């Protein structure tokens, strides 16, 4: 009985797993390429993971706003009576009760010092900035400035507001300090924004054609200052040209070069004249350079007179 139940359970499990196996095989197998172009094989990977997911890259423009002057306005004047100070300092949130009245005594003795210390902390964001007394609350409002940023200017990131409350609890507006010599703020924001980086696509054969241009860009950026300042790029070539210029600057070397050129020119003229003379003698029929000599030593002889006798 147990064996029959076990066999039935195994058969049901096999029937349930069969559609899932058929679906995975159908997904992993590439479609039939009927036209023979091979375009359908690019959508599948050889690892058996199925069809590759479509990767969509979204580019969100980064916005950078300059922080304007921080202005604080007091809603009510500071209390001057001891009762009001005590009432304002005893109101604390839950979980931060004073121990033995010591903190209350310190607040009563030095209310101005604690208010100045609390006011010196820099505001983190556009949030409420309460002081130590609850009666006189001050709100810090961030005035957004224009979004245009000048080149080679950057707002100082570590800006702290150190102005203490003067008069009736008002704080003087402190403008952010701008220094020169840095890259534009928009370029920094674009570099730090991860959404601007486009992901690398996956597929068969794409890794073979991926080139890393960061080293070349760094080498080109490092070589630009030298080329702008007129620095030599190849020290060996510049050394050779400098040595040749130094040799030509000497008068002895320059005179020797000119004399050698003149001697060569004279030798070429003589060679051409000799060749022309040989060609002329060849046309006359004599290949020797000397004049032809007569056999009798050059003496003149009269021809013999022949007499004819008539019969």
From Swiss-Prot:
Q: Name one Pfam family in it.
A: Syndecan
Q: Where is this site: Cleavage of ectodomain?
A: 251-252
| Basic and acidic residues composition-biased segments | 151-162, 169-180
How is the protein disposed in the membrane?
A: Single-pass type I membrane protein
Location in the cell reads: Membrane; Secreted; Secreted, Extracellular exosome
Please list the residue ranges that the record places on the Cytoplasmic side of the membrane. 277-311
Q: Record's Gene Ontology CC terms?
A: cell surface; extracellular region; membrane
Record PTM text: Shedding is enhanced by a number of factors such as heparanase, thrombin or EGF. Also by stress and wound healing. PMA-mediated shedding is inhibited by TIMP3.
GO BP: cell migration
At the top level, the lineage of the source is Eukaryota
The keyword Ion transport is assigned to this record: no
**Would the keyword Signal be found if you checked this record's keyword annotation?**
yes
Composition skew (Acidic residues), residue ranges: 32-42
Q: Region annotation Disordered: residue ranges? A: 31-85, 141-244, 285-311
Segments traversing the membrane: 256-276
Pull the Extracellular topological domain ranges from the record. Answer: 23-255
List the InterPro entries.
Answer: Neurexin-like, Syndecan, Syndecan/Neurexin_dom, Syndecan_CS
**Entry keywords, A to Z:** Glycoprotein, Heparan sulfate, Membrane, Phosphoprotein, Proteoglycan, Secreted, Signal, Transmembrane, Transmembrane helix
Biased segments, Low complexity type: 71-84, 215-226
Could you say which protein family the record assigns here? Belongs to the syndecan proteoglycan family.
Give the protein name, as stated in the record. Syndecan-1
Species per Swiss-Prot/TrEMBL record: Bos taurus
The taxonomy runs: Eukaryota, Metazoa, Chordata, Craniata, Vertebrata
- Encoding gene per record: SDC1
